[in-house]
Curated annotation (Swiss-Prot):
The chain crosses the membrane at residues 78-98, 129-149, 165-185, 212-232, 261-281, 338-358. This is Phosphatidate cytidylyltransferase 2. One of its GO terms (molecular function) is phosphatidate cytidylyltransferase activity. The keyword Transcription does not apply. It comes from the Eukaryota. It is found in: Endoplasmic reticulum membrane. Residues 1-38 have a biased composition (Basic and acidic residues). One of its GO terms (biological process) is lipid droplet formation. It comes from Rattus norvegicus. It is a multi-pass membrane protein. The modification Phosphoserine is found at residues 20, 32, 34, 36. InterPro entries: PC_trans (IPR000374), PC_Trfase_euk (IPR016720). Homodimer. The keyword Lipid biosynthesis applies.
Length: 443
């Protein structure tokens, strides 16, 4: 009798309630079914994406050594490409960073699309790329305003875009937000919000951190090259130590990682970071901030190096003196800051472990098959993004000070009466300190 009464109540329920119940049920089935399918799916099979030339040349080797040579050859090719783009200068580097960012975004969004494409979500891919455009417009607009200030103030259209940049950015994002709301359809509400969150988390991880990479680049190419090179060195040396000496598994998320590779990569990266920092600190083109020259309409990297990049003498602790026989040693202060290579080798790999967990959750081996033996672009940059964020925070906390050129640029945009007020205030301050009179006497 109780069951009959409950059935009668359900049958007497309004149509709207019935629809909402069925919709909630379908949403629940959608989420749970997709999760169960992901959990019960077979392990990913390895796809041989090795070029045919290498396949023929390495056909007599075992799969282990074949993978060693494929990874090694492609790694050398990528390092050569890295040297070429460094030679081409900061503008090319900035464009490469943007291209890498777009490719990484594409790889992550494609995974989501492949998982849920059977549900035919409306506008999912279109809105994902639209939000990427909006966020890039915001961040790159901020960068252009900050580092191309004189150029922006000189051109009327750019000045207007700069003045209302944040309002325009917000309007663009709001348009995408409204488009998403209008695209919501019954039976897919929960799934559509899943993908909305997926897109925004991807934007946070990829676009925001690539923007920080560009900021590091403008602080001086050394802040761009050394951190990236340390991560590359750690990847290579950890793989080599693990390949030859690896016996003890490091973490379940990535079974091929070993403690031997982790420790060997750590020491090799620290030594490499110190040596690379010493070499690069002697060149102005690497240590000077990248600035826009209004007269030549180009970037310049010429300056008087700061104390951070001038050789100084340091006393060696007594314990070490007895071992090496030296009382003092000359080194660049930047080499002390190159201890950030410690971060690259101790914390940086956790970016890779995070990516491994993500791939295991979706039963995929790599983000893509862009680079034979390595996977996708995101497989190569999972540690780089974490490193870029750390370097940017490190510079802001311990290195960066007021930038005189930027202050002068802002000063020149003020009204004449405001400029005169600042001039008189500065003159009074320098006179009270005795700095102005001393400068006049020296002249």
């Amino acid at each position: 009798m109780t069951e009959l009464r409950q059935r009668a109540v359900r049958e007497d329920a309004p149509p709207e309630d019935k629809e909402s119940e069925s919709e909630a049920k379908l949403d629940g089935e959608t989420a749970s079914d997709s999760e169960s399918r992901a959990e019960t799916a077979p392990p990913p099979t390895s796809i041989d994406d090795t070029p045919e030339v290498l396949n023929r040349a390495l056909s007599n080797l075992s799969s282990r050594w074949k993978n060693w040579w494929v990874r090694g050859i492609l790694t050398m090719a990528m390092i050569a490409f890295f040297f070429i783009i460094i030679y081409l200068g900061p503008m090319v580097l900035m464009m490469i960073v943007m291209c890498v960012q777009i490719k990484c975004f594409h790889e992550i969004i494609t995974i989501g699309y492949n998982v849920y494409h059977s549900y035919d979500l409306p506008w999912f891919r279109t809105l994902s790329w639209y939000f990427l455009l909006c966020v890039n417009y915001f961040f790159y607009g901020e960068t252009v305003t900050d580092y191309f200030f004189t150029l922006v103030q000189r051109e009327e259209p750019l000045r207007i875009l700069s003045k209302y940049h944040r309002f325009i950015s917000f309007t663009l994002y709001l348009t995408g937000f409204c488009m998403f709301v209008l695209s919501l359809v019954k039976k897919h509400y929960r799934l559509q919000f899943y993908m909305f969150g997926w897109t925004h988390v991807t934007l946070l991880i990829v676009v925001t951190q690539s923007h920080l990479v560009i900021h590091n680049l403008f602080e001086g190419m050394i802040w761009f090259i050394v951190p990236i090179s340390c991560v590359i060195c750690n990847d290579i040396m950890a793989y080599m130590f693990g390949f030859f000496f690896g016996r003890t598994p490091l973490i379940k998320l990535s079974p091929k990682k070993t403690w031997e590779g982790f420790i060997g990569g750590f020491f090799a990266t620290v030594v490499f970071g110190l040596l690379l920092s010493y070499v690069m600190s002697g060149y102005r083109c690497f240590v000077c901030p990248v600035e826009y020259n209004n007269d030549t309409n180009s970037f310049t990297v010429d300056c008087e190096p700061s104390d951070l990049f001038r050789l100084q003498e340091y006393n060696i602790p007594g314990v070490i003196q007895s071992l090496v026989g030296w009382k003092t040693m000359r080194m660049y202060p930047f080499q002390i800051h190159s201890a950030l290579s410690t971060f690259a080798s101790l914390i940086g790999p956790f970016g890779g472990f995070f990516a491994s967990g993500f791939k295991r959750a979706f039963k995929i081996k790599d983000f893509a098959n862009t680079i034979p033996g390595h996977g996708g672009i995101m497989d190569r940059f999972d540690c780089q993004y974490l490193m870029a964020t750390f370097v940017n925070v490190y510079i802001a906390s311990f290195i960066r000070g007021p930038n005189p050129s930027k202050l002068i640029q802002q000063f020149l945009t003020l009204r004449p009466d405001q400029q005169l007020h600042i001039f008189n205030t500065l003159k009074s301050h320098l006179t009270d300190k005795g700095i102005l009179m001393s400068a006049l006497e020296e002249e």
